[in-house]
């Protein structure tokens, strides 16, 4: 009887396109935006307000990222469950597989322990036979997690700016075209206090970019500096594996690394003048720039 069950090595093209569209639709419906989760966590946990009051910004960023990430993973679990539960309703091949498995198992004739055992067997075989769909969903989740990690970091930093009353323009706030109009590319995420300030005097504006992980991607920032002739750029990161050699190389490209206090003040890094903590960045560097514009 099993010969009647469709054998799927890869998704049929039409179903792949439909499944990809379903993933996007369900993801938008069941996974909350980073900004919504950040606001929720901050409203429910007063610890973060205390951390800001005591100027422990490294801990604030670390703990908030962890909490927001956990909320995201909870959303992802619900999203996965609902999508897989609805799979047989929405796509023909999973529907056919499940109907054959249920028919072959004669599940409607069974009761008690035999019914429970049959349900387990059907669920296991169904999961195995629709695995190409599960695999494609897993690839989508991996991609989404990468982009979500970066987006969440941005939202957290911008929320800090707002709480501290710092004016800023970001690509997500004013649009890509505004940044393009002053010659800045997509590698620049924000300007403090504003694009107008940058236009008026470049060396009295803080140009910022954010990367959760440096690896080789910081070189994209160096290329942006070279292309746009920006005097200096602040690269905010939560990457804790910053070597002295990498920091020195970035210093040669006028990149100031903004990172956790314990990283900036670690034995290998603390002598590097282009590596500063979130605390120094938020309570020294930015206020000094903003003072200039308040004259």
Each model region followed by its residue ranges:
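Acidic-basic catalytic patches of nuclease active cores, encompassing PD-(D/E)XK
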Residues: 130-177
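Short charge-dense sequence patches
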Residues: 101-114, 139-140, 165-172, 197-199, ...
């Amino acid at each position: 009887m099993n010969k009647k069950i469709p054998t799927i090595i890869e998704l049929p093209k039409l179903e792949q396109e439909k499944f990809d569209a379903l993933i996007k639709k369900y993801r938008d419906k069941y996974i909350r935006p980073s900004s919504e989760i950040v606001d929720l966590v901050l409203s429910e946990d007063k610890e973060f307000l205390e951390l800001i009051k005591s100027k422990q910004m490294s801990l604030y960023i670390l703990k908030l990222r962890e909490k927001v990430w956990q909320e995201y993973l909870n959303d992802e679990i619900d999203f996965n469950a609902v999508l897989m539960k609805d799979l047989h309703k929405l796509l023909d091949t999973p529907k056919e597989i499940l109907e054959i498995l249920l028919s072959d198992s004669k599940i409607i004739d069974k009761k008690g322990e035999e019914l429970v055992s049959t349900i387990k067997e059907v669920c296991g075989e169904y999961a195995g036979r629709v695995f190409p769909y599960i695999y494609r969903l897993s690839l989508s989740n991996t991609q989404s997690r990468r982009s979500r990690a970066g987006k969440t970091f941005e939202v957290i930093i911008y929320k800090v700016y707002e709480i501290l009353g710092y004016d800023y323009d970001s690509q997500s706030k004013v649009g890509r075209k505004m940044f393009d109009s002053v010659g800045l590319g997509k590698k620049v995420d924000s300007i403090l206090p504003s694009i107008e300030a940058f236009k008026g005097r470049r060396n009295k504006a803080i140009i910022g970019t954010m990367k959760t992980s440096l690896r080789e991607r910081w070189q994209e920032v160096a290329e942006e500096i070279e292309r746009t002739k920006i005097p200096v750029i602040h690269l905010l990161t939560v990457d804790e594996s910053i070597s002295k050699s990498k920091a020195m190389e970035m210093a040669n490209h006028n990149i100031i690394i903004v990172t956790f206090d314990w990283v900036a003040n670690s034995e290998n890094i603390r002598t590097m003048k282009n590596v500063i903590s979130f605390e120094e960045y938020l309570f020294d560097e930015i206020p000094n720039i903003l003072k200039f514009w308040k004259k």
